[in-house]
């Protein structure tokens, strides 16, 4: 059957993810490594320049300046966060239930507190030593004024003019790592509220159907993921060759106070003609990922503040997160197929994609069977 089919898996695979485009990966630590390299190179260059000129005073001044500025930056950040406390006090009862400890913990939590404490301690010791050993050089009013400016004025000015605001890249990276994107919430909701309930029961529902149990060869749920996020109410509207032919027996589950809530899957038939006049029928359990329509509606609703470009980004994150969640779910393993595609009804036909996946799977099975045949 695979040799007769008009489509092979690699025909569609040539278009990355069926015209959807590349799926981005989580950001790594390249920015952190680059910053560390800049610090090392800059420090080494300055140290070599001072050493080359045999400037002992220069080395002392370099050590003093590094400790001086580092400590002032740390103290300046603490002062800035004290200013944040002034706002949180107004919300102490509504947000923190009147707990002062929670207010301070939320405001003064640092990601790398051990590292910050270590740097601040070393800087303090270095600064104290320099002031004690070379007090006639460094114990001056102008240095004290500069220290206070760095602690009290510069951090507040940078905050007021917006220099402390995270860039879109940093915001995106933070949201991705902490599951704070809209897409992350939708993916988790889709899994816990639907897929985790129906996928473990899918094989049983297929076997209960006298009509479909022998017609459905791909015993999994095919989940359509259009990049446009637009989902048709009827898949036949997107591709007339994908025709609904019935439903599997429904699963009835008590959920959220609803007794025997009904979950059921639609079965679609695709008829593919061959040049010799014959035709092949395929049956798939296929449906759209319904949360994508929420993203589509949000991008059209002004108050949701989700632009078209941001929606395109969120759908990629949704697919990535859903892939990650399902990949770790033993109860859903082998019972689903995620299908990202462009959503362009003219360029990437749903029927062609499904049949190509089916035929490609058959080719892989045939190849595995040939490999497993023992040689005489």
Swiss-Prot record:
GO terms for molecular function: 2',3'-cyclic GMP-AMP binding; cyclic-di-GMP binding. It is a multi-pass membrane protein. 2',3'-cUAMP binds at residues 194, 255, 259, 261, 290. Keywords: Immunity, Innate immunity, Membrane, Transmembrane, Transmembrane helix. Its main location: membrane. GO terms for biological process: activation of innate immune response; autophagosome assembly; innate immune response; positive regulation of macroautophagy; positive regulation of type I interferon production; reticulophagy. Facilitator of innate immune signaling that acts as a sensor of second messenger signals produced by cyclic GMP-AMP synthase-like receptors (cGLRs) and promotes the production of type I interferon. Innate immune response is triggered in response to nucleotides from viruses and bacteria delivered to the cytoplasm. Acts by binding cyclic dinucleotides: recognizes and binds cyclic UMP-AMP (2',3'-cUAMP) and 2'-3' linked cGAMP (2'-3'-cGAMP), two second messengers produced by cGLRs in response to nucleotides in the cytosol, such as double-stranded RNA (dsRNA). This is Stimulator of interferon genes protein 1. It comes from Stylophora pistillata (Smooth cauliflower coral). The gene is STING1.
